[in-house]
Amino acid sequence: MDYLKTVVPSQLMAERGANLVVINPGSSNVRIGFASQDVPFNIPHCIARHITQRKDDTPRLSVRDKMLNCHATPSQNAERERAYDIIASLLKIPFLDEEMPSANQALPPKMGRVDALSSQQNKDDSKFTWTDVMDRSIKSSTPIVDKDADVDPLQRSTPDDTEPNSEENMYKEIIFGEDALKIPPSESYCLSHPIRRGHFNISQDYSLHQVLEDLRTIWNWILTEKLHINPRDRHLYSAILVLGETFDNREIKEMLSIVLCDLGFSTAVIHQEALAAAFGNGLSTSCVVNIGAQVTQVVCVEDGVALPHTALALPYGGDDISRCLLWVQRRHRTWPNFQTDPVNRPIDMLMLNKLKESYSQIRSGSFDAVSVVHSYEHEKSVGHQKTKLSALNVPPMGLLYPRVLVPEEYPPPPRSWFQDYDDMLEDTWQTSDSLYSSGNGGFGMWDNYPMFPTRLKKFDNIGLVEAIVSSILSTGRIELQRKLFCSIQLVGGTASTAGLAPVLEQRVLNTIPSNQPIEKAEVLQSRSYPLFVPWKGGVILGVLDIGRDAWIHREDWAKNGVHIGSGRKYRDSYFLQAQAMCYYNS
């Protein structure tokens, strides 16, 4: 302990972080890096596999995200219009039937405008290159362990079973990361996202086995190609999994098995994302608001312990704001005549996310920006047009008024998913059939998961302000409530939205019931980029964990799996039961 008091933090990170790999998986991106790094690799959490088309089929890119509801229903459109009117009134945005200035007229005094594109930026934004799907590397008759480790032997073409110059062998079998999002639509690839809305993307068309295989392949590729860790040397490394509170016990167990058994790490530990976020900003008590790409989580942390009864999950995030941006532009008739389809064309979603990150902010009055919008309908000639984007302050307000977002819905997993016989805390065999949906009910993927109804409360239609107030007030102690209201912490990519923090402060304070003796609400400024705060917190927790009482060894996990022990650490953790049941005799 004397050494910890005198050592420089950077030196401690370098000494103990060289053999620690921190993995923070999300629905849209996965953040992986050595604990000794300042920032992790942030890579799209997806994989594209080459598929063989029948002769009578037209080759095309397919997206394996089966959704019950991709487009807004008439009732949802009506609610969305009402929500837009409320937001427009609050932000003092002129309605469409009011007279708007033409493109040649000067903007009125209350209308803001951002001409953020310089000539050089305009030139760079107009350039786009599709992913080259042809494998131009030289095929060797001797397989290389490092390169072949991330490919399933059953799906990999080898010189022994195919001709080297065959047409099938010319295509890349697997494409990862952002390259997978830029595959030309005419190519025969299937794009898969293993995680959606904070859960495994299991459906009748995407089996659990394939989800796990895709996770293993993606993570293995990052470890090999980005971190340059040879599969034969991974027994020298330990892994830290920083997982969100939305993940189910079985999902945690499966990811732990991937890290230890498939990827070959010697030991691993799991940390809650909310707890890691608090430590990442140097806090021990905080209300952590994690605004992810597809899920927003609110969890209160007291003295380094996440309080389970305060956890809330909201089924919307940054991706929904990006789609709302497109809807707002079409509503204002400012979007070019492009067939933009963010659901079925991943490159369109990538473009909308970049527009959102560049221009969306919360501010009063009309807010416009001039930007280049791309059309990816024709592969040989990617079209682009410079256009004025209107009401850019409306989409991020969807965090406060979620009815304007209209998130897509995913079907529930098959019934067999709920039968986890290893979980000693769940009597799934006693669950009646009425608790499961047939898949046609139109509800979110996991909303009817019945095993722990109070484990993580989920709300579809409440805004972020109401969620924060409800979470903090559920602690029940006025002293703690005052601390939490003064230490609200925003993490996640969307947390960087300009103007979000002051709006939350004001609205949270106004939403607190008048009978509560609380006079102040404050959103703390993040010490680093909010997207990487949970990952950085995982680094800190891993480096400072000297005793490693909660670390799980590969041999013990492979032999015993989930079992009860006598250790005390994480015994009271309500979320990480997959790890909490794996104690070690002290």
Curated annotation (Swiss-Prot):
Record-annotated disulphide pairs: none
TM segment ranges: none
CDD domains: ASKHA_NBD_Arp8-like
Region of interest called Disordered, as start-end residue ranges on this chain: 141-169
InterPro entries: Actin, ATPase_NBD
Family to which this protein belongs: Belongs to the actin family. ARP8 subfamily.
Identification of the protein by name: Actin-related protein 9
Organism: Oryza sativa subsp. indica (Rice)
Phylogenetic classification of the source organism: Eukaryota, Viridiplantae, Streptophyta, Embryophyta, Tracheophyta
